[in-house]
Amino acid sequence: MIDDLELGRTLLLFAWAFCLAGIEIEIEGGYGWAERLPTWFLKRGAVGRVYGVLMGHRPLTGYHVFAFAIPVIVLHFPYVFGVEWTLAGELTTLAVFFVIAVVWDYLWFVLNPAYTVRRFRRGAVWWFEVPWLWRFPLDYFSGVALSIVLAALAAWSAGDSRPLVTHLWMLVGLAVLVAATVALAPLYHRWYRHMRRSGADDRDVTRTYPPPDPEAVWNGGEPDLSPLGRGDDERSGR
């Protein structure tokens, strides 16, 4: 059975996935996979093609480079705070990442008023043009399966079944928490709409002003990839 430490870890990992989903909803709204963000999309070239094969033909985006890198880095924090690195530990860390990625992604749909569980289905999500099994895209099953394989390899490397057993119990705990979130999601949807009701937003009374050179980020046309010279910086006032 799962002990108190593992229960706490499962709750913390779920809370992390929940917050990742929540912040992405605030950033993206109903337009997932960075569809309307000022980032780049890459499907061509060796990197774009390989990524597409591994990720169900989805484009690699600048947003997702960092969105995926941050959880991987955070999960490795224990190794620089005194926990000894081992192959079994690394495999366990990667197993946790793939589970978190699935939970985080699904919660984005559960909590997002533009989708909800009812509207999360085949043909309604352009970046999930992959086979679906029941109500879920194949990517979710492959992500969970990969995490179990990694946990099994961790157990084999450690010569101890506990990494696999612990991982399986974590999956059970996360499944229960996801189910509870599905049931309670209407409360989040209500709060989401409440914060956006007419007259509630204080953007119009908040003093804002544009950046010095918004065109330097992206003007919607061909990007200027030439390096800035000293004269360019002086003319722009930077």
Describe the role of every protein-language-model region:
Residues M1-L225:
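Aromatic-rich, lipid-facing transmembrane alpha helices and their immediate juxtamembrane interface loops
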Residues R230-G231, R235:
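A cross-taxon signal for low-complexity, glycine/charged-rich
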Residues R238:
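Compact soluble domain cores
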